[in-house]
Each structure stands twice: as structure tokens, then as C-alpha cells.
Amino acid sequence: MILQLQQKYFTIGGDKFNITDENGTPVYQAKEIFFKLRGNAHLYDVQGNEICFMEAKILSWFGQYNIWAREGDTTPLGIFKGTFYPVPFVKRWRLDYMGKKFVVKCGPYNCKVFPSDDNWKYDKKHMAGHIHKRLLKIRDTYKMDFDESALPPQIAAIITLWFDTAFHNNQH
């Protein structure tokens, strides 16, 4: 399955946009809020019901994003946590979302997602998804190509939204 996220380049106060499938049908809606100390984003279903709220943790050595069911909750649904990775221009993140674990390796314009076991070990040959930031487009565009059996669409949308929030928010 393919999900596509398209945003406007210039917005004031936040950006609301659709996440569509390969046919252009809206599957999710998202909203990013830029003028806050911490980067955050909301993910909604097509009817406008909030699925999750993502918020950056300020004091974290390699970076951390908490995923909540809604703003103000006390127990997170999931956590994106950065880890040490000695390769230049590549960052490795761990996603633990509702008991499912993934290792996410990101460069400046692409991201690879691997399913992981409880010890964060993964097989490099079995990639669950791949995100590309599409260059030379009128709108800020991300394309997530993923295997639905290894990576549920909701988690794929969360990872795509996180990739934009964590790596490309300062470009708006």
C-alpha cells in the first residue's frame, strides 16, 4: 500500500492536510502546530476523530517523541526514541507503539522501517516500509510505500507524520 502526505510550503500557525492512499482517496487527516517550543502533530481519521497526538520531549539526549491518545493523557500509546548510530547523516530511531516494535533508519530525505523483536534486533532484508521525501514538487510531499501485513496503515501514517515533524518542520 502507498500513503502520500502533501503539505503547503507556507502556513501561519499550523498546517492541516490529508494523508491519501495511492488512488488519492483521503485516509487520514493531520495537523501540525509550528509555533510551540516542542514540535507536535495530531492525527485524525477521515471523520475528524483524533487517533493520536505526537509531542517532542525537550530534554532527551538523542531525541524522543511521545505518542498520546489525546492531549493531556498521562500514559503514552507509543514512544519514538533516538539511539546512537555511528554513520554520518543517518539516524536510528526505535518505535514502540502499543506493543509493536519497529527500528526506523532515517537519512535527510528517506526513511526505512524494519519490524523488530523485543530486544530491538531486526533483519535488514525484511523492510516493512520506506518513506521518500519527493523533491522538486510544488507542495511538500512524502510517499510511504509499505507492506500492510508487516506495518499497519495507522502506524505507517504515524511514522510518515513523525518523519515530517522531526526532520523537516523547520522548513515551513
Regions found by a protein language model. Name each.
Residues 1-172:
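Intrinsically disordered, low-complexity proline/glycine-rich segments
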